[in-house]
């Protein structure tokens, strides 16, 4: 599979002829050169309802007919608007021909509309486990994500203010013991301005993975 980090929390996965977008914050994203018209997603996965994660979801799904996958209560809003949806609750998994999406906890708030809880995502694709922490503070149950299988790749927010900062994110990396870790959700807005080296200095060398924005890599 090919994975592309488009800055902030926007991730693209290409696998088995499918395009999967996660938290497609494109319009207003100061990092990516990707435009909504460049994309034709089959699935859009959302961690929660804040605008910098929902982003261009509706425009993209209207154009491509993508299935929106998110937490059970939040997904109802999209279903009422006529979108194709899948909405498992915390701990639930939805199975697709390209992989599995499990909805897992995150410690964060959500917007008033659409309703729903903030989540993380555990993706099993081609036998590999990808942990998308979403917006979250540090919490001890993160270590359960990889209890049956080592996490191959984790995306952890480091921006502070709205999520955990570099210190807590580095501790989270030690908890989850992923093979590779990518920091996200930082330097997008003034309150989350960070020096990424404040995160890297406390992360074991073998876990460090630097993703170039808009540049796909193989997993």
From Swiss-Prot:
GO terms for molecular function: hydrolase activity. It comes from the Bacteria. Pfam families: Lactamase_B_2. Keywords: Hydrolase. Disulfide bonds: none annotated. The keyword Transcription does not apply. Belongs to the UPF0173 family. This is UPF0173 metal-dependent hydrolase LSL_0324.
